[in-house]
Amino acid sequence: MIGMSRASKQSRSMIQAFLVAVGGAIGSVLRYYVSQLALRIAGPAFPWGTLTVNVVGCFIIGVFAEMIVRRFDASPELRLLLITGFLGGLTTFSSFSLDAISLYERGATVASAVYIAASVGLSLAAVIGGLALMRAIL
């Protein structure tokens, strides 16, 4: 940002923050709806909603990483909107952690361990799958 005035830097920063906020709002609302749907379908015994949004979000970040970052040299603004904002709002490590501890504290030790292993394993596999899909297509 050499040569940019202080006002220009502040304006750019505000636009970037706005893009993150918009993407985050959309991702957060989608996470809410997915969690509510999972709760209605599967009930409250296991955190299917959090697992779903985290795994899907990991697949999408694999797709986005290959497609918009590496292949199409996306603008920093598009990256902020989609990766930092949307996927940051959609996925949730804090809810995953709380869900795992809640299962454990309720005495569902095996379910907690399965949830942790499934979350980490499936999420990593989803990123790899997203990357591989885009590499095969592009």
Question: Which stretches of residues belong to each language-model region?
Answer:
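Membrane-interface helix-loop junctions in multi-pass transporters/channels
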Residues: M1-L138
